[in-house]
Design a protein with these regions (language model features):
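Catalytic core of soluble alpha/beta enzymes
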Residues: 1-144
Length: 144
């Protein structure tokens, strides 16, 4: 198993820390609802070693600056970042660029079954084509 996202309720920091201690060396324990892209909640998670990665949703916390702060904090903590879409997403491919810019371990945008999702995957392919040989797959610490 490569990843587990939100295995417990959104305030169960102790339970998250327990599973991260048990499985965190070989599995990404991803905090989504636990952190909601909020730096204050992430700081608590870092202190408690609750997870080893975070799901980042650009429009969840409110501003690009706050999102950047969350990504920076995750990097300082040694966490992997997973950039994610939100329900009700548009066909704007910006999160493909964000995921590339921050060397996101993964991008979460769902199956390529609807236009708004396909737009993101197509943009990732365009980015890879444009970068050529400089393109690198971050892939998270477990895939490197």
């Amino acid at each position: 198993m490569l990843t587990i996202e939100d295995p417990f309720a959104e305030d169960s920091f102790d339970s998250f820390a327990s599973i991260t201690r048990r499985l965190g060396k070989e599995t990404l324990i991803i905090g989504d609802d636990l952190y909601v892209t909020d730096v204050a909640r992430m700081k608590k998670g870092i202190r408690m070693e609750a997870t080893n990665s975070v799901l980042i949703k650009l429009n969840q916390i409110g501003t690009v600056s706050e999102t950047e702060d969350a990504i920076d904090l995750a990097g300082k903590a040694g966490w992997d970042v997973v950039v994610s879409h939100r329900s009700g997403e548009t066909d704007d491919p910006f999160i493909a660029h964000l995921a590339t810019a921050v060397s996101s371990a993964f991008i979460k945008t769902g199956a390529p079954a609807r236009g708004e999702r396909v737009a993101k995957y197509n943009e990732l392919m365009r980015i890879e084509e444009q970068l050529g040989r400089k393109a690198q797959y971050a892939g998270g610490r477990l895939i490197r």
